[in-house]
């Protein structure tokens, strides 16, 4: 399958979810256990995380035909492959170089890199003869235990954002670099509170001193909608990782039309939003782990 067709299929599915599920479009797929490669034990990321979660399989384990075959497993007859997309990097050949690239090569002898997308067919563990996948434990719950809350609080504290309890609307203030959250008691559940806080925490990663995303868009603008989509996807990823059920924010319904228009008209909008959301999650994991290790030391 060519990458254009693969991206078109993903875009169609997400637009369909936005139309049918509205502001709740992430819940149906983010509630599932995160997809993982059965052989490498690495989690699928970004768009692939979402795309593989759209399927109806019970197992969250996946692999290519070659990977399954390398372990002696066979695909069940009639099984239809799913796919994943990866951005790969290669060095250009010297005879492909032009202009400044050629000048640089003649001076340094270093070949520049180029990026391209590659599509791989994958099969779920449910489609494999004789393979017994570990039972998937859906850890998401509408009620958080004291231990759950302590773990989430520790993760957020290790990330290090400044959080102010004030007002009745949650937001992130990029100029002053703080997160404003209403009093926790004003939320119906702990789940709603932490789902909201993880959304604002994703915004927090965009500060110029961190990932430096464009957060200058005014309310209702296309740039504002882009940043909100990144935060929505990023918080969905974080909720899945922290075992928090994703809750719907009433104010997100107003972004839906902007998101659907943006995704429909710009072929790169969706992949860019998922990529930036994944980078935000990676950043938070990295600094929280680093600070947690400091505390132990």
Descriptions of predicted regions:
Residues 1-297:
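N-terminal accessory/interface modules of nucleic-acid-binding and processing proteins
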